[in-house]
Design a protein with these regions (language model features):
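Short, small-hydrophobic-rich alpha-helical interface motif
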Residues: 14, 33, 37, 47-58, ...
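A short pre-motif secondary-structure segment
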Residues: 137-138
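Short amphipathic alpha-helical boundary/capping segments
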Residues: 9-13, 121-130
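Sigma70-family region 2
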Residues: 15-16, 42, 53-71, 91
């Protein structure tokens, strides 16, 4: 397919980094590209974001294109791939939410949550019966410090810990 003179000038100016020409190209093709993305994604805002991202990606490699057909093919392929990646990501996210919801609705979750709360309540009530030093040792141990670290921090013998 032969390019007309306008297309040849457009391609050369884009290739040379002329931002005014990019703006013209953007205004001419943005709605078309968003419409194409919208055939893959339901959210028009997401589609606009995808197209904006592809324009940025194009600008980084603009020197690689010698004709308008190649530029448009790049846009369509990049938009398609970006949309498909978004869909895959959304599917993974949805699967995680579904699995998480199933767990939250399960009896296991209820049992674990109740047990944790009860155990925490019992421990909290029992800690108040410890001496101040014993409380410090316990808190440091719960903070995953070693006996040596606890002894050094509190200035006591390791055997006391």
């Amino acid at each position: 397919m032969c390019m007309n003179n306008r297309d040849q000038v457009l391609v050369e100016e884009l290739k040379n980094g002329k931002e005014k020409t990019l703006k013209i190209f953007y205004e001419e093709y943005f709605a078309l590209f968003v419409s194409f993305a919208n055939s893959l994604l339901p959210s028009e805002e997401e589609c606009k974001d995808v197209v904006h991202d592809v324009f940025l990606k194009y600008w980084d490699c603009k020197e690689d294109f010698n004709n308008l057909i190649a530029i448009r093919a790049f846009f369509y392929k990049s938009i398609r791939n970006t949309c498909l990646n978004l869909i895959r990501h959304q599917q993974v996210h949805q699967k995680y939410l579904t699995e998480n919801l199933q767990y939250l609705e399960s009896d296991d979750f209820m049992h674990e949550t109740i047990m944790k709360k009860e155990i925490f309540h019992i421990i909290h009530n029992e800690i108040k019966y410890l001496t101040a030093m014993e409380q410090k040792v316990l808190l440091l141990a719960l903070g995953e410090k070693s006996n040596e670290e606890i002894a050094q921090e509190l200035g006591i013998a390791v055997s006391t810990v």
